[in-house]
Amino acid sequence: MAKLLSCVLGPRLYKIYRERDSERAPASVPETPTAVTAPHSSSWDTYYQPRALEKHADSILALASVFWSISYYSSPFAFFYLYRKGYLSLSKVVPFSHYAGTLLLLLAGVACLRGIGRWTNPQYRQFITILEATHRNQSSENKRQLANYNFDFRSWPVDFHWEEPSSRKESRGGPSRRGVALLRPEPLHRGTADTLLNRVKKLPCQITSYLVAHTLGRRMLYPGSVYLLQKALMPVLLQGQARLVEECNGRRAKLLACDGNEIDTMFVDRRGTAEPQGQKLVICCEGNAGFYEVGCVSTPLEAGYSVLGWNHPGFAGSTGVPFPQNEANAMDVVVQFAIHRLGFQPQDIIIYAWSIGGFTATWAAMSYPDVSAMILDASFDDLVPLALKVMPDSWRGLVTRTVRQHLNLNNAEQLCRYQGPVLLIRRTKDEIITTTVPEDIMSNRGNDLLLKLLQHRYPRVMAEEGLRVVRQWLEASSQLEEASIYSRWEVEEDWCLSVLRSYQAEHGPDFPWSVGEDMSADGRRQLALFLARKHLHNFEATHCTPLPAQNFQMPWHL
């Protein structure tokens, strides 16, 4: 009877992975009392085959889930319509509640029938036995056997806790349950006294901004968190997970962040290969509709690196909602997991981000300054210009206030706090992070990210002449035009390198540098062009084109 109840309440099983010979336990090693033998690919098909009763009951419950999601998103309009028609009176609500209660009872009955169907299936009984054994005892053998199954991630046991590192238990400087530290925007009116009257005046605007951010704004910014989109992408995500596990020997893990969100991760270890880049770990930060199953992790994987991918809060197996604070909390536990559980030193970690993933990448580089390098692909400096691009001009004040208070993705500000090597990849046909049209390459916000980085690190070089010539170089729409501008100013790379190395040897590596202070205008132009070319590479493609492995290059450093 207990097993039947477990089948009724158990998670949905999607797939049974092919077990690799290298992962099977040696015959000489005795099993623990709670260990259960996992199925081999020779006995069962790798795709879970539900019985007819479970299959039909699952279809009914999945349809009910879709209808509930549609009802949730349309509820404001539905309530408004019902109110206008007078259907929200007590005489109308009571019968409706009876219908809703009856429907819930019917769905509970369908769930019980699904449980009976699972109970009669030896594949599911084997799986639920392993899952229960792992929850009782998270031994390496039990976790190895559980990794052979792909199921609803909510039931996956937690593999790593944000407080697990001993240094955080002893130190009071780490993150609290409220979250890690973020850079906050400065008040808009610094000279105005923050009196009670001013607070009351601002209250309607603050309430409006909060409602916009938590309804329309968050879903527009992170469409991958919308349940209906995830439901449509589920077959593709399952195929992507199967490829990472079966072909790349990936290991899935659940991390618990300081805010209570559970973060879905996938780790591919290449340290045992002959390729030297396998000793480096690339932590990948996906875009606003990207998932590690089908996202930018493929680029460093093809290049031979060890890779750690993770999903934003609210994406696929990760819980929560993707607001900046939750995003930073998730990134924090991912980096801690890489260092304290996977055993990588910060000097062996590379942060790689695509598009909106630049926020968590720059936060990690700012908070963990010892990481080896950072690569930002198709990213931007600040969210406000891009948000204003897609909203009406009459909403400018509301949009700016909402972004600054609730969705402040200040990539450039965080990037300037990082002292290590940085490479920016600008897509010359980008249709997402341009503020006008894709053909207008100067409206690409990657330009502003580069300029802010160089102006912070080399303020004397990027004054007047240097800034002007870098803008000319950024206007080039082809490699031929770039080379023409570079050769026009007769940039001597050996001279530029010697100047920078001499300054570093005398003053140290910490930015900002005052190099160029006593330099001629021609020298500043040469140095500015040299630095711009080293920090930004062009890729002739649109925003969502996968980055080829040959374009995944380590950033330049002295």
Swiss-Prot record:
GO terms for biological process: monoacylglycerol catabolic process; phosphatidylserine catabolic process; prostaglandin catabolic process. GO terms for cellular component: membrane. Its main location: membrane. It is found in: Membrane. The keyword Ubl conjugation does not apply. Residues 281-407 form the AB hydrolase-1 domain. This is Phosphatidylserine lipase ABHD16A. It comes from Homo sapiens (Human).
